[in-house]
Amino acid sequence: VHNLPELNLEHPAVREYVYGATDSVVRSHLREGVDGWRLDVAVDIGFQWLEELTRAAHAEKPGSLVVGEVANYPKEWFPALDGVINFTLRSIVLQAAAGDLDPALAQRMIDRLAAECGTAPLLKSWLMLDNHDTARLASVLPGQRQRRLAQVLQFTLPGAPCLYYGSEVGMTGGEDPEMRAPMRWDLVSAGHPMLAWTRRLVALRRDHRALRIGDYRPVTAQRLLAFERHTDRAADTVIVVANPGAVEVTETLMPANSKLMGTQPLVDRLGGRPRQKLRTGLLDITLPP
């Protein structure tokens, strides 16, 4: 394409033009007010050049953010990038919500990803359930229960929730170009159940510091998907428990948090269940599908 040339980053002059020189593309736009860069198909650039680009951005503007579109397992793309568009976590969430991935296996996958990548890079990454390159959420998960479970995980796992326009009102769309259809403004109404649910999740994340900046801790479970988000303050603790299965599950969980007192009642922020307390560090719970 004449106006979209393919640049050879192995050539030093090209690297200087893109991010190395003072008047390079990356540096000059940061000086003009841009706060970061979202790199399309970042895997094609490779580790070395991405790391140089990210360092150049930080040198020009400390605190700037470089996020890359990475469909690979994200571990080794840090610190070449500050964050990624987390396709791996998206796949785990959607398959677990659909019932195609056993909860215990999904839990082990998430735990490993969190341990290997580290919380800090994940917090700078984007967690999306659909975008312009994928089928829309309502088409992937037609059932409301499955969609809501996936959204809960999107807003409570480490990462910045990234919403695709129209998904908050249940827009459908399969392969290209369906998923890129114009916004369905006719679906927007104050009483739309999916919009109301999305707003509840936005408020939940806004109101709980642990969900925005907190560390991740696995919660030992077998048939439920469970984890904890916490900061250095015991009050900033959120235990997330989800039942992706089709039947009610009664299980004893182990949050393994020494700061949680048995006298402190736990409050259900989404389901409205009665308050309950830990029993010698364990949590007895019954959760419907």
Regions found by a protein language model. Give the residues of each.
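Substrate-binding/active-site clefts of carbohydrate-active enzymes
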Residues: V1-E32, L53, A57-A59, E76
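Active-site-proximal helices and loops of the catalytic beta/alpha 8
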Residues: D35-A120, S125, P142-Q144, L153, ...
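Carbohydrate-interacting/catalytic domains
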Residues: R108, R147, P158-L163, S167-P289
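Short, solvent-exposed helix-loop connector elements
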Residues: A135-P142
